[in-house]
Amino acid sequence: MNNRFLFLSISAIMLLTGNVCSAQVTGTIVNKEKQPVGDAFVTLTCKGKPAKSISTSNKKGIFSVETKMLEGQDCILEIKHAAYAPYLLSLQKIPKAIELDTIRLEENVLEEVTVKADRFINKVDRKLLFPSQDDIKRSNSGYDLIDKVNLPSIYVDMANKKVEKRGSGSVPIFINEKRASQADVVALRPDEVVRIEYIDNPGVEFGLETHAAVINIVVKPRMNGMSIGFNLNDAVTTMNGKNYIYAQYNHRLSKWGIYYQNDFSKLSRRHIDQTDTYTLADGNLHEIRREGINTKLAYANHDFGITYDLTKKGQYSFITQVSSHFYNSPNRGHRQRIFETGKPTYYALTEPTEHYFSPIIDLFFRRYFKKNRTLTFNLVGTMYDTKYGYSFKTFDNEDFDLPTSQYGYDTDGKRYSLIGDIKYSQPLGKSNWTSGISHLQGYTKNKYTGTSDIINEMHNSSTYLYSQISGRFSQLRYMLGIGGSYQYYSQGTESYYYFLLRPSLSLSYPILGKGNIRYVFNISPNAPSLANLSNNRQQSNEYEYHVGNPNLKSYSRYTQTLTLSYEHKYFYIENTTGYMYSQKPILEEITRNGKTNGKTWFDFGYEQQKSAADFWNYTNVQFYVIPNVLTLDGGFSYLLSRYVGNNYTHNFHRLWGYVGTKLFLGKWNFRASWSAKERNFNGESENTTGQNIEAQVNYKLTQDLSIGLYGSHLFLKNGSTFGEATHSQFVKKDLTVYIPEWGNMISLNLTWNLSRGRKYQSEQKGVWNRDNETGIFRGK
């Protein structure tokens, strides 16, 4: 009986102990030498829970944090120690017990970290976001995850696999601080994502190019295993699609990868309406009205790449990628019926064609040193082999058989470039210092045959040095950087060089508890493109010539922004006011010329104008009607622009907005949005993109397989529309491109991902260099 009582007592104690111990997060903390770290301060902060669970690691580095009453919550685990950098870990839907893998801390403190149980952690140049477990489960790719987490002002074009900051332009995607291709983002497994960094204030380390924003996805790739998958997005209403296939294999320190992607379109209904009004030398108006006739459109892109990655955690990382890009556009012309002053009705055929091949090799190496110091090397070689042609023909009849006049030219272009980059980073107390140097060497040779038979040979080089420091004083976060560049360009016997500076200052301060205010000032240099610098002159039609200008000089753009943001459990609001000013910008200029016989023609080119200024205000609001289930968002902007040229002044006003909603119900995802017509002005030209109504529904059949439907330009008779208008004192133009086959376009999306293998915490960080210049002069 005593033995039975003893057995029952021991069993009860064991059960009680098990129940007590199960409500906790446990783990072991070590340093880079794998030695245990004692006296580390561990906190667990959960959404909707004001109190924090607190613990301290023992001499063996072991800690345990009580999670009683926190089951099912989304939390952030923070580890602090005076001798090490802070460590953050997102924990979603906490079960009763979690036993974490060994956690390794890096030496030295980079910056004091404020951990909040909110969607965002604000930094001086970025917002940190930890995707919830629901976000991860609902997502099929990197693009899908970016869309699900609702970054402020960010729009994800799921059909074309593009990310934009609404009203500001495209947003490049980085994975572990290395620029990612579309295929890389498609192949990204959402369950490998540690956090998303929304860099809405890119610093000088991103080079001379000024990005509206940058998104960096921090992932923990697989150490052993494989992944294979595809993402197919093809229209069922017309010939249009974008498809990706990829495979990766990991073994110990190595990873091999291969991918293929294509996008294509083949349409039979596309037309361009255009009205041109010329003020001739004698003061008379001459009008040419072009009525569009449906014409075929066809193009195809093909990308293929292989990747090898050799990484030894904490010591080095070597990545090499070889890729090729093929583009072919055999049918890109348009037919028109012409009504011209003083002439009978006639017809015209405009035919631009383009084919190019571009191989790229990208070598990346990163070395890790003690005290959290890193040194990065990147070398990218690019080649473009381009065949471009432009032809404009007129005809007496609708058969388009015997041309009565024709203008045009053909181009055989070659472009070679090599970009090298070195970047060094190390902590300085509670600040972080980053410096680097980048050099580009390029050679371009374009042979033109047509109106003028010429050969353009251009050499260009660019050397860019930068240094940046970021940190904080009490609650004030700061980032101060400066970049300097030496640019060289030569063409024929002429050569030019100039120096560019890019200083940048950012100040950020928390207000009203969960609010933040940020001021940004920067000077961004702008260099002329190789195409505009070309010493070239080509005739487009009877009245128009397009000319290059090798005398163009760089100019600087001064920008100031003030951003206020506030986050609440049920909403997020952000307002940005900005002002931008440019002295002697490169803008369009149209010159009228005439002969004694009364013949008038117009040169379209670029010149240094007097000034350009933009003032804008943009407000973005997100309502979490049912958190993690139903979200409503919208944005509204106002833009005022003023361009002062050598012989013109233009004032431009624009109002723009959008509304959208996202709904998540179990395995179902729904998304719908409306965006207004977008208008932009530059120099003497206005560009418009028509309104868009889109909707998407997805169903997750299994964890690895999902199917969906995507509709774009819904309920719009003319489908996708694009417009251009010229407001010169000599030439008035109004052009609209109609693509009705893209109206009510329904696409079927099928995504499959299969992966096997365990994971590890990634340490890859890097840079991105790519040359997209061809220097080719393109007709309109």
Please name every model-derived segment.
Residues 43-45, 78-84, 97-135, 144, ...:
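Short, acidic, small-residue-rich periplasmic hinge/interaction motif at the N-terminus
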Residues 48-62:
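Short, acidic Ser/Thr/Gly-rich low-complexity loop/linker segments typical of extracellular
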Residues 99-104, 112, 116, 142-145, ...:
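N-terminal periplasmic accessory domains that precede
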Residues 143-178:
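Extracytoplasmic beta-strand/coil segments of soluble accessory domains associated
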Residues 176-205, 245:
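Short acidic/polar hinge/loop motifs at secondary-structure boundaries
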Residues 208-215, 223-273, 298-301:
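Outer-membrane beta-barrel translocator/receptor signature
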Residues 254-255, 301-327, 350-494, 500-503, ...:
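Face-selective signature of the C-terminal outer-membrane beta-barrel domain
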Residues 515, 525-575, 581, 602-615, ...:
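Outer-membrane beta-barrel signature, preferentially recognizing the C-terminal barrel domain
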